[in-house]
């Protein structure tokens, strides 16, 4: 019996080795494997989400889909990724197919709008050809396409109202992604598609939710992030933002199905200090007794707001705590700005 199991194990190892040679590392791996594919990443702006991805953020040289219902925080998350890439000296491009980007809001999130390249294409083919040219240049670190639903084929725009256009967008996406996949890998560009959730008509069993653009994007994406709005964030009875849950529904680089929750504050974006406090508490770096938080021998305050104020007054602690959190989670680098102002919130 043991000899039979040993032979099976050897046969499996040979098969996995051959698969890895043909399709790359991470094509098949144990679900609970601690080992992760080593890849360069861009932080998401949320420490909890960086940990949930298993690799520290949005992978470069790969395709990522961020999808969710309207006003769930998809574009906010993508803009935070752009801001993090720019902080590290990277070049970022925003392909605004929806023609809806607000530069003032982007600036509040930390985006260097003066050095952000933006394109507002007239139709889907133009948007994807622009993306392909930029990727092939090898000079761009991250490209965000907002959104797949707005990538309308030229034929559809030039056709008559009410004319059947079944499957044209799906074919467009399928053709484009076959070309883009290899180019993205060679250029080490992070390509992010923002997508919406729609409901299938007449579905009585199973999940009625779907995303526009056909199945190609689901197939070619190395990482898919589902963004859900949980509820309002209130302070003194006043709504100041909303709580978001992001689920990693597909991950070729680390075990999938991890989740992260964080707050998005109106006009400010992701509350990075709130995120840091929650993650540090969950990992045992902060201790909590009742509503009091402590860090080692230091008493930080009663309630999150007092802890935030304490950290803003002692910015040197932010980076120290951030590093400890990342080490405890198996990540490296820093994602929190040392700031005593609004950006540190």
Swiss-Prot record:
Instruction: Return the SMART domains for the record.
Output: AAA
Positions that bind ATP: 68-75
Where's it mainly located? cytoplasm
Record GO biological process: DNA recombination; DNA repair; SOS response
Q: Which Gene3D superfamilies match?
A: P-loop containing nucleotide triphosphate hydrolases
GO-annotated molecular function: ATP binding; ATP hydrolysis activity; ATP-dependent DNA damage sensor activity; damaged DNA binding; single-stranded DNA binding
- Which InterPro entries would you find in this protein's record? AAA+_ATPase (IPR003593), DNA_recomb/repair_RecA (IPR013765), DNA_recomb/repair_RecA_CS (IPR020584), P-loop_NTPase (IPR027417), RecA-like_C (IPR049261), RecA-like_N (IPR049428), RecA_ATP-bd (IPR020588), RecA_C_sf (IPR023400)
* Keyword field: ATP-binding, Cytoplasm, DNA damage, DNA recombination, DNA repair, DNA-binding, Nucleotide-binding, SOS response
Localisation: Cytoplasm
The cross-references to Pfam families, in alphabetical order and at most eight, read:
RecA (PF00154), RecA_C (PF21096)
Q: Name one GO cellular component term.
A: cytoplasm
Give the stretches traversing the membrane. none
* Purpose of the protein: Can catalyze the hydrolysis of ATP in the presence of single-stranded DNA, the ATP-dependent uptake of single-stranded DNA by duplex DNA, and the ATP-dependent hybridization of homologous single-stranded DNAs. It interacts with LexA causing its activation and leading to its autocatalytic cleavage.
Which family does the UniProt entry place this protein in?
A: Belongs to the RecA family.
Q: Which NCBIfam families match?
A: tigrfam_recA
* Protein name per UniProt: Protein RecA
